[in-house]
């Protein structure tokens, strides 16, 4: 080849790409990553069938973030990085709805005390529809009426360009930046047949589980909790700082098309819903349907009313729509509502009644809860006679008093609560009032003005309620810690109420699961001082149980005239105690429950802030009771879903000598919690920069904590003794309690398994089960659902509520439903109960 040829001259330049080439490549790769990540999000949120692991998604996401940082001008409007939120706004712009966002007419089906519905209003709706169609026979679609915030999403050329709240129906607020953080709202529509323009109407809401997690974080951060998921969703969507919205998991379900140009032209509403899913939206699968007549609609409505408490989201009824879009147009609108749709509300969950008295209940942790005793009222399908007032702050805020007419709410299995007072109905009394003449009089001045009969004013009949100063059960002082909303009885296990509630919790199905020992028997044992501590349960015998039974049943007349249950009369006429089956069953239940799973045992102890989930986290992180007992607070605070407040509560519990003595007594009585597989890797909570950053009274970032660790030679001895460390650290470690904490940390980590040991299963992990995802469906022959879940989790597996491509096994019992069908369709392995037990070993 001629070295002077012009091809050879340009070869070097070809090896070095120009700035425009780099930019073109970056633009192409950004487009590729954006499309790829949006497709993965669609598979995850809409199809519930992810095709890549989370780690792969995260890796690609970080790659896209880096490219966009280097080339901000190339960032696309549908980039998934927008879901983390942007800079705060000064305010929300107004958006005028081209198609008004109208409301629906309500229909109600009252339910009598026998649970029978009166569907007269729905039959009337059906008749109006038929009349409007000149006797035509409509089909109906019924779907959930979500208790959230209505919004409108506008897409142009498949890209989300605007999101607006309903507002007054004509004008709403532009919340586009916030809506882009909602994970299951597509930023770019999917599929090939996307319209040039489409405006999708739907509801933004917060799932019940996400609401509970948010309120837990609010409480841990000393912030006011939200009253309900709807308020939480509305407040989150209207944040000026979209980064806050991004932290609060919101969800969206579409329910109608306001306008559309191009794309698939639906003839029925049920087709619209299917089109939504094809475009990338999520649907409330299994909770909507199309039916041929109103009777089928009402049957589904009643089924959904029963199913309501189990749903992952709040609904307050069902929306019924004429399916045919042509028939919808024919029926048209009346005022500001369509004739072809109705909001079929569930039976009232709120009702008016009168507060007859206010007293208090003492919980197992000593919490003093004011309770309103009510005139019986039928609400939410049951007769309600009591309602919680939560705490003194809530009583004062709502100003609930004896005699007040109040609104009571009961939703699903939630404890009834007093929502508000109807102040105009408050009972009043007339009282004399002295009117001053403006002249100062001595106390004995004969001319000083005195109240006259006609100088009166109305004042409330009853004074504002205040909690008692002493426990009504044990007379111990009621105390309220600074910053706490709840007041507590200081009596501990000396208080019969706390003792009874603590023992009931200890023996409950989700805790120690002591078969045969119910609330009634525990209350009787406590009332007679036969059981003072948890360990006393394991010292019970038949004579003690018989004594409990006889004392509880005995009346003055019976004690002289007739033998009690479990006794016989001998020739001498004296009562002779005989063993009875019920007592033997209780003792057998106590004995069989002596080897609980570690998570159940921890939950049973009644540690404040430790529910089932937190107990499982502790068991999975530490593996043995001894490690949990000795876990230092900073290490606890590093665990998933355990913040500083919960960590402090756990550490405080195990730091108390009486609690350690109580556990020792249980162990001495033969209780032996099982060893749990360590399935949360130690690195999750043992990385030095993490626990150092969580040391009490020493504020430091994780980056600075890492630097401190390296300065100390990467060992705790260095933290304890190195004199070259920063002065603020040396001052902190010089405090006796902090020096003791460092020594505790050193001892604790010496006993914890290493990362490799945990991975190799040195703590009894079942390698065939560890890290696998199981779904349970149907009724198993011998195991209850929670028993099967506990066995799987104890072996290191996970249990999910839905089937996806991530599912490893579906355990199917009798009457397995749609989960089994989906598992077969996805090729997921199906196990019987026997096969599960074999796998578990």
From Swiss-Prot:
<dbReference type="GO" id="GO:0006260">
    <property type="term" value="P:DNA replication"/>
</dbReference>
<keyword id="KW-0235">DNA replication</keyword>
<protein>
    <recommendedName>
        <fullName>DNA ligase</fullName>
        <ecNumber>6.5.1.2</ecNumber>
    </recommendedName>
</protein>
<dbReference type="InterPro" id="IPR013840">
    <property type="entry name" value="DNAligase_N"/>
</dbReference>
<feature type="binding site">
    <location>
        <begin position="54"/>
        <end position="58"/>
    </location>
    <ligand>
        <name>NAD(+)</name>
    </ligand>
</feature>
<feature type="binding site">
    <location>
        <position position="321"/>
    </location>
    <ligand>
        <name>NAD(+)</name>
    </ligand>
</feature>
<dbReference type="GO" id="GO:0046872">
    <property type="term" value="F:metal ion binding"/>
</dbReference>
<dbReference type="InterPro" id="IPR004149">
    <property type="entry name" value="Znf_DNAligase_C4"/>
</dbReference>
<feature type="binding site">
    <location>
        <position position="495"/>
    </location>
    <ligand>
        <name>Zn(2+)</name>
    </ligand>
</feature>
<dbReference type="Pfam" id="PF12826">
    <property type="entry name" value="HHH_2"/>
</dbReference>
<keyword id="KW-0234">DNA repair</keyword>
<dbReference type="InterPro" id="IPR033136">
    <property type="entry name" value="DNA_ligase_CS"/>
</dbReference>
<dbReference type="GO" id="GO:0005829">
    <property type="term" value="C:cytosol"/>
</dbReference>
<feature type="binding site">
    <location>
        <position position="489"/>
    </location>
    <ligand>
        <name>Zn(2+)</name>
    </ligand>
</feature>
<feature type="binding site">
    <location>
        <position position="203"/>
    </location>
    <ligand>
        <name>NAD(+)</name>
    </ligand>
</feature>
<keyword id="KW-0464">Manganese</keyword>
<dbReference type="Pfam" id="PF01653">
    <property type="entry name" value="DNA_ligase_aden"/>
</dbReference>
<feature type="active site" description="N6-AMP-lysine intermediate">
    <location>
        <position position="145"/>
    </location>
</feature>
<dbReference type="InterPro" id="IPR018239">
    <property type="entry name" value="DNA_ligase_AS"/>
</dbReference>
<keyword id="KW-0227">DNA damage</keyword>
<keyword id="KW-0862">Zinc</keyword>
<feature type="binding site">
    <location>
        <position position="143"/>
    </location>
    <ligand>
        <name>NAD(+)</name>
    </ligand>
</feature>
<dbReference type="InterPro" id="IPR041663">
    <property type="entry name" value="DisA/LigA_HHH"/>
</dbReference>
<keyword id="KW-0436">Ligase</keyword>
<keyword id="KW-0460">Magnesium</keyword>
<dbReference type="InterPro" id="IPR004150">
    <property type="entry name" value="NAD_DNA_ligase_OB"/>
</dbReference>
<keyword id="KW-0520">NAD</keyword>
<feature type="binding site">
    <location>
        <begin position="103"/>
        <end position="104"/>
    </location>
    <ligand>
        <name>NAD(+)</name>
    </ligand>
</feature>
<feature type="binding site">
    <location>
        <position position="345"/>
    </location>
    <ligand>
        <name>NAD(+)</name>
    </ligand>
</feature>
<feature type="binding site">
    <location>
        <position position="471"/>
    </location>
    <ligand>
        <name>Zn(2+)</name>
    </ligand>
</feature>
<dbReference type="InterPro" id="IPR001357">
    <property type="entry name" value="BRCT_dom"/>
</dbReference>
<dbReference type="GO" id="GO:0006281">
    <property type="term" value="P:DNA repair"/>
</dbReference>
<comment type="similarity">
    <text>Belongs to the NAD-dependent DNA ligase family. LigA subfamily.</text>
</comment>
<feature type="region of interest" description="Disordered">
    <location>
        <begin position="554"/>
        <end position="575"/>
    </location>
</feature>
<dbReference type="Pfam" id="PF00533">
    <property type="entry name" value="BRCT"/>
</dbReference>
<dbReference type="GO" id="GO:0003911">
    <property type="term" value="F:DNA ligase (NAD+) activity"/>
</dbReference>
<keyword id="KW-0479">Metal-binding</keyword>
<dbReference type="Pfam" id="PF03119">
    <property type="entry name" value="DNA_ligase_ZBD"/>
</dbReference>
<dbReference type="InterPro" id="IPR013839">
    <property type="entry name" value="DNAligase_adenylation"/>
</dbReference>
<dbReference type="Pfam" id="PF03120">
    <property type="entry name" value="DNA_ligase_OB"/>
</dbReference>
<feature type="binding site">
    <location>
        <position position="166"/>
    </location>
    <ligand>
        <name>NAD(+)</name>
    </ligand>
</feature>
<dbReference type="InterPro" id="IPR036420">
    <property type="entry name" value="BRCT_dom_sf"/>
</dbReference>
């Amino acid at each position: 080849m001629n070295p002077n040829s012009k091809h050879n001259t340009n070869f070097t330049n070809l090896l070095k790409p120009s700035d425009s080439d780099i930019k073109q490549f970056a633009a192409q790769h950004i487009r590729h990553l954006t499309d790829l990540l949006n497709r993965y999000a669609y598979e995850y949120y809409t199809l519930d069938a992810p095709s890549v692991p989370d780690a792969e998604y995260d890796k690609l996401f970080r790659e896209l973030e880096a490219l966009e940082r280097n080339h901000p001008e190339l960032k696309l409007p549908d980039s998934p990085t927008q879901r983390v939120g942007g800079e705060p706004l000064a305010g929300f712009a107004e958006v005028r709805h081209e198609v008004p966002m109208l409301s629906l007419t309500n229909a109600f089906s009252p339910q009598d005390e026998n649970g029978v519905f009166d569907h007269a209003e729905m039959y009337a709706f059906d008749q109006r529809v038929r009349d409007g169609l000149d006797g035509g026979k409509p089909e109906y679609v019924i779907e959930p009426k979500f208790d959230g915030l209505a919004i409108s999403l506008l897409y142009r050329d498949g890209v989300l360009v605007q999101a607006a709240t309903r507002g007054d129906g004509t004008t709403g607020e532009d919340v586009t930046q916030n809506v882009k953080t909602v994970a299951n709202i597509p930023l770019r529509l999917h599929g090939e047949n996307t319209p040039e323009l489409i405006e999708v109407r739907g509801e933004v809401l917060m799932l019940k589980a996400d609401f509970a997690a948010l309120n837990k974080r609010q409480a841990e951060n000393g912030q006011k909790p939200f009253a309900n998921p709807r308020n939480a969703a509305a407040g989150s969507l209207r944040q000026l700082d979209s980064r806050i919205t991004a932290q609060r998991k919101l969800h969206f379900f579409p329910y109608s098309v306001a306008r559309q140009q191009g794309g698939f032209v639906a003839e029925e509403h049920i087709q619209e819903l299917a089109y939504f899913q094809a475009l990338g939206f999520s649907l409330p699968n299994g909770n909507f349907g199309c039916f041929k007549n109103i009777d089928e609609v009402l049957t589904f409505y009643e089924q959904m009313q029963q199913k309501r408490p189990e749903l992952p989201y709040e609904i307050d009824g069902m929306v019924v729509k004429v399916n045919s879009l042509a028939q919808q147009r024919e029926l048209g609108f009346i005022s500001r509502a369509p004739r072809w749709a109705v909001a079929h509300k569930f039976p009232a969950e709120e009702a008016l009644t009168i507060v007859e008295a206010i007293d208090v209940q003492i919980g197992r942790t000593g919490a003093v809860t004011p309770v309103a005793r009510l005139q019986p009222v039928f609400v939410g399908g049951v007769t309600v006679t009591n309602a919680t007032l939560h705490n003194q702050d809530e009583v004062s805020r709502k100003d609930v008093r004896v005699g007040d007419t109040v609104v009571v709410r009961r939703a699903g299995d939630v404890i009834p609560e007093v929502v508000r007072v109807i102040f105009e109905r408050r009972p009043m009394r007339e009282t004399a009032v002295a009117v001053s003449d403006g002249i100062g009089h001595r106390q004995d001045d004969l001319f000083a003005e005195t109240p006259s009969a006609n100088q009166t004013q109305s004042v409330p009949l009853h004074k504002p309620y205040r909690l008692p100063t002493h426990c009504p059960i044990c007379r111990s002082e009621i105390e309220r810690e600074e910053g706490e909303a709840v007041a507590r009885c200081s009596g501990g296990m000396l208080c019969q109420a706390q003792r009874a509630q603590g023992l009931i919790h200890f023996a409950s199905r989700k805790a120690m699961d002591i078969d045969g020992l119910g609330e009634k028997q525990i209350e009787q044992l406590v009332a007679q001082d036969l059981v003072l501590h948890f360990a006393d349960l394991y010292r019970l015998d038949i004579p003690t149980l018989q004594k409990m039974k006889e004392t509880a049943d005995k009346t003055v007349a019976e004690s002289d005239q007739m033998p009690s249950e479990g006794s016989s009369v001998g020739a001498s006429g004296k009562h002779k105690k005989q063993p009875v089956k019920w007592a033997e069953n209780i003792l057998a239940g106590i004995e069989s429950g002596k080897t609980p799973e570690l998570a159940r045992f921890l939950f049973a102890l009644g540690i404040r802030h430790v529910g089932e989930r937190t107990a499982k986290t502790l068991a999975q992180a530490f593996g043995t009771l001894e490690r949990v007992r000795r876990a230092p607070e900073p290490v606890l605070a590093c665990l998933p879903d355990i913040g500083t407040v919960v960590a402090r509560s756990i550490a405080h519990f195990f730091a108390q000598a009486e609690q350690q003595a109580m556990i020792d007594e249980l162990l001495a009585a033969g209780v032996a919690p099982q060893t749990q597989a360590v399935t949360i890797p130690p690195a999750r909570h043992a990385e030095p920069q993490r626990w150092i950053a969580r040391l009490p009274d020493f504020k430091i970032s994780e980056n600075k904590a890492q630097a401190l660790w390296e300065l100390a030679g990467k060992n705790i001895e260095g933290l304890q003794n190195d004199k070259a460390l920063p002065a603020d650290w040396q001052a902190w470690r010089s405090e006796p309690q902090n020096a003791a904490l460092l020594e505790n940390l050193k001892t604790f980590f010496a006993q914890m398994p290493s990362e490799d040991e945990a991975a190799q299963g040195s703590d009894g992990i079942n390698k065939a089960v560890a890290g696998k995802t199981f779904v349970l469906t149907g009724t198993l022959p011998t195991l209850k659902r929670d028993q099967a879940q506990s066995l799987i989790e104890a072996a290191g597996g996970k249990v999910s509520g839905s089937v996806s491509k991530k599912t490893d096994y579906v355990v199917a019992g009798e009457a397995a439903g749609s989960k089994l069908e989906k598992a077969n369709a996805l090729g997921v392995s199906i196990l019987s109960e026997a096969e599960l037990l074999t796998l578990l070993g």
